Amino acid sequence: MNRKYLIIAVAVLALGCIGTLQAFTHLETQDPQEIRGIVVDEYDAAWYKQQQTLWLKKAQANPTDEHAWEQCFSAARYADMLQEQYGMTDRKKAVLDEMAKHIPNSFTYNLAMYQTKRDMYGEDASPWAEKALQQIPENIGRQDASMLIAYLEMSGKCFSDKKTQETSHELIELLYKNNAYPSYLLRYADNCMRGMEGNALYFINGDVPWYGSRILQEALDLHKDKKVIPISFLAIPAYRDALCQSLGIRPFEAKENYDSIDNLYHEVLEYIINKSKRPAYFSPHFNSSQADDFPLKLYNEGLVFRYSAKRYDNMAVAQRNVEEKYHLEYLLEPQYVNEDQWQGSERIQLNYMVMLAPVVKNYKQAGDTLHANRLARYLSAAVTRTSLPQEEKQKYFNLLSDKK
């Protein structure tokens, strides 16, 4: 029965929680719009190309305007990204060449070069990031701060170097003080970690869940005993070795060649979990293709999957988390502070329904209508909060149906 719940959760998550980008190809104004990133807004490549043109005009009108150049480059970068084009593309090179003429040696130019070089195989992008770290402006934005936080983490220095730790801490604190991430994303991240055992390993996918978790740890001093590990970083030797050292285990010895990056992830994950002997959890954004047979060892404990080589009553743990650890009341409360609902990330709230609907059914089967109805209200509220079309919301409401 527990395995069935797991399979259902994984299947619905794969089909329902990975949103497709909506197309907004029209421009209602000739003024450029702020490029807030794909985790915030859902636009297509054509929209970003149009914004690149508009921001380029603005930058050319005032060639020393770093914000205009940053927005122009960001638009070019996202246009390429949505077409699966990375590295020094013609689109980004055209913008970078202009930036080199007008704002050379600036924070904006150095960070843009870092982002570009980072995506080029065999290129060392770190010199550009190091230059940018020496030029951090007081009004640094969310995307730039997040980029540097990720760089510092990937370097592996955050595990041992005091200066790197301080810089990362200051940048993360700045994200919190500037309300860079909506509170509902932080509340979701908090609930995910509330149900974990102490000193846990938390393997995670996606920018929003990772930054949300790090803000809780660094700015609010919560869940600091847990290691929040972006799975994609495990492919980076410097990060991987530093992580292993911090866990008190020998560095992972990678083979010279792997059939795929997913095979590397599989071996590294198994190695770290088994050698560290710590409880290990995976976010529901975990892509099972990254680790072959991992779904056979993952058990839904509420909002995260726990890794276990042996079967156990995971639904009992999920119910205990719902009753004793998760703070779900906020889903029913009015919004006291008006804050953005990020279209590119709001689907994360659907994981409440996807992951916890099996718990509602478990309550019903046990005849516990009180807990079943209460939890169903919370989950329905999480879906209602999103801006999805009603017909799409209904697909999630149907997860509470007694029909098989």
Residue ranges and their predicted role:
Residues M1-Q30:
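Bacterial Sec-dependent N-terminal signal peptides
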Residues T20-G198, E218-K404:
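ER/secretory pathway lumenal C-terminal domains and tails of membrane proteins involved
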Residues Y211-I215:
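Phosphate- and divalent-cation-binding pockets in alpha/beta enzyme and binding domains
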Residues G195, N199, G206-W210:
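Local sequence-structure signature of Cys/Sec-based thiol-disulfide redox active-site neighborhoods
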Residues L13-G16, E153, F203, Y299:
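Generic detector of intrinsically disordered, low-complexity, polar/charged segments
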Residues F203-D207, I231-S232:
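Short His-Asn-centered micro-motif
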